[in-house]
Amino acid sequence: MFLNKCEGDLGELRKPGDSEGTPPAAAEEEQPKKKHRRNRTTFTTYQLHELERAFEKSHYPDVYSREELAMKVNLPEVRVQVWFQNRRAKWRRQEKMEASSMKLHDTPMLSFNRPPMTANVGPMSNSLPLDPWLTSPISSATPVHSIPGFMGAPQALQPPYGGHSFLNTPPGMAQGMQPMAPAPYQCGTPFVDKYPLEDVDQRSSSIASLRMKAKEHIQTIDKTWQPI
């Protein structure tokens, strides 16, 4: 009976948490902690406009300016302070991006940032004379007989002018094929043999006979003038 009484007293003294063997404080610690959720403020268009105007005036407003602005836009001063912190961080990021883009643009090694060079080959080629050693000595469009100092062949060796094809071409093409300037040293009318070989022989024999007659006449005159 004594044992039964002791067991009954012990059962009354026990608690529900002790039956499990773990204290209630440890059981609460084992439960996962809930993360603190931040309340995001949704700004109206009017509030954003006033905040941006204040940021343009000063990036670091003091407490009095923030309180005055908070009363104006109907927001807590803490929310206004957080907005200015976020706005300054955004402004710094923009400044860094602009500085990096300017450095890339000013780098001389990057050729793709340079403006393309315009080639003015046409006006330069028209204004500057060409090197005479690089040009051909005689242009194919210039006729040979128009070159100064050229001695033309006799007309007997040249084909008649009626046989040239450029005389039968249209006037527009014929003007383009004419020489650029008249030749200053063209030979005159070529020698044409008007007398055949027989006439030349007769003339030479007649000249010789005339010379003989002249000598005989001089000799007769000398004889007549000799003293008697």
Swiss-Prot record:
One cellular component (GO) term of this entry: nucleus
GO biological process: positive regulation of transcription by RNA polymerase II; regulation of transcription by RNA polymerase II
Region (Disordered): 1-41
Pfam families with a match to the protein in the record: Homeodomain, OAR
UniProt entry keywords in alphabetical sequence: Developmental protein, DNA-binding, Homeobox, Nucleus, Transcription, Transcription regulation
Domain of life, source organism: Eukaryota
Signal peptide (from-to): none
Keyword Isomerase: no
Coiled coil: none
UniProt GO MF annotations: DNA-binding transcription factor activity, RNA polymerase II-specific; RNA polymerase II cis-regulatory region sequence-specific DNA binding
Location in the cell: Nucleus
Biased composition (Basic and acidic residues): 1-18
Annotated motif OAR, positions: 205-218
Main location, first listed in the record: nucleus
Record motif Nuclear localization signal, residues: 211-215
Residue ranges the UniProt entry marks as DNA-binding: 36-95
Function noted in UniProt: Plays a critical role in eye formation by regulating the initial specification of retinal cells and/or their subsequent proliferation.
Family the UniProt entry places it in: Belongs to the paired homeobox family. Bicoid subfamily.
PANTHER family recorded: HOMEOBOX PROTEIN, PUTATIVE-RELATED, RETINA AND ANTERIOR NEURAL FOLD HOMEOBOX PROTEIN 2
Name the UniProt record assigns to this protein: Retinal homeobox protein Rx1
Source organism: Gallus gallus (Chicken)
Gene (name only): RX1
